[in-house]
Amino acid sequence: MQVVAFTGAGISKESGIDTFQDRPGIRDKLTRTFATNHPEEYRKVMKEFCDTIKGKEPNNAHKELARAGVKIITMNVDGLHEKAGSYDVLAIHGRLPEEHELPYCESLRNAPVLYEDKAPRYQDAFDIVYGL
């Protein structure tokens, strides 16, 4: 039997990463329109987001999924599944920008996937589920 875990912000909350519900207004700043029209403020938001996640460690849930070797489909961009040792992770909303990408992060695609952008990994997630 194949097991797939679907995870989102809740799994990383115990690691000290707030959910979007804990950060009112953040969704409005994670749109392609905002990134294009307000690139400096968008860069600031992304830097703050990256700084918040920097130094965070996987919690027991991340570690147990890694230990069990469970395939993971996650909406998170924090990389904690990979940091816990999971090797089969599909991050459907992409990743955070690397430090050297922050000065031009408004032009990146899938780092992370922004609201209004096509999420290119959704079909991969559907394929995994349909293959169960």
Which residues make up each language-model segment?
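Conserved catalytic core of sirtuin-type NAD+-dependent deacylases
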Residues: 1-132
